[in-house]
Amino acid sequence: MRGVCPRRVRDGTEPAVISRYPEAVTGSVPRPLLFLDVDGPLIPFGAAPRRYPVYGVASAPGAGGNPLLARIDPEHGVRLRMLPCDLVWATSWMADANECIAPRLGLPQLPVVTWPGAPDTGQHDERDGLHWKTRALVGWAAGRSFAWVDDEITRTDRAWVSAHHPGPALLHRVDPGTGLTSADYLTLGRWLRTAGGLPHPRTAPGLVNGPASCG
């Protein structure tokens, strides 16, 4: 699905990967993390014959970019920044998410989860029905409260996180046919405020709870 990122560095170097939020951002009481997938939540797919809206162009002509990038609604960036959390890319796009996705959403360079190359563990998890991201995300969070937004989350993942993660966690599955919706943002906003010990201000219908900036 990914194709080629038109902003990918072509000289053999890799874009910088931010591995963690610095202490100055997290402070003594860190906000919840939000691990964000791209394909499904931000780039809807698989709902043929539905025609998806197109927002701008995927890439310059001849750049070999992924045409599905044009499905990314820039409004997601506004809504994500309103959530009281620290955003982290948790996607197979890895560093390309900062190069290709973040600019379309008006987001800064975000930390990126890098997936460990442990084929034996991955094969074992797959046999047990555990998603290949789950173990790495729990390790990355290191006990910190987190929400994980993905289109492939199952009961097995929720049970594993409940047994292995000491802090609050929300594993929120998004319908890949629609991507993130207002209802999803409402659920995320409420949970993140509760996990972060914040009040729940009244908001107009369709708006995300909270003025705090994510990222």
Each predicted region: which residue ranges?
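Non-catalytic pre-domain segments flanking phosphatase-related domains
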Residues: 2-36, 46, 197-215
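Serine/threonine-rich low-complexity intrinsically disordered regions
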Residues: 5, 44, 60-62, 66, ...
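Intrinsically disordered, low-complexity regions enriched in small/polar residues
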Residues: 7, 23, 37, 54-57, ...
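A broad, low-specificity signal marking well-ordered, structured residues that form hydrophobic/aromatic
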Residues: 10, 87, 172
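Alpha-helical substrate-recognition element adjacent to the catalytic core
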Residues: 19-20, 26-123, 193, 214-215
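A general structural signal for short secondary-structure junctions and capping/turn motifs
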Residues: 25-26, 79-80, 139-140, 164
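C-terminal cap/substrate-recognition subdomain and adjoining C-terminal extension
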Residues: 100-215
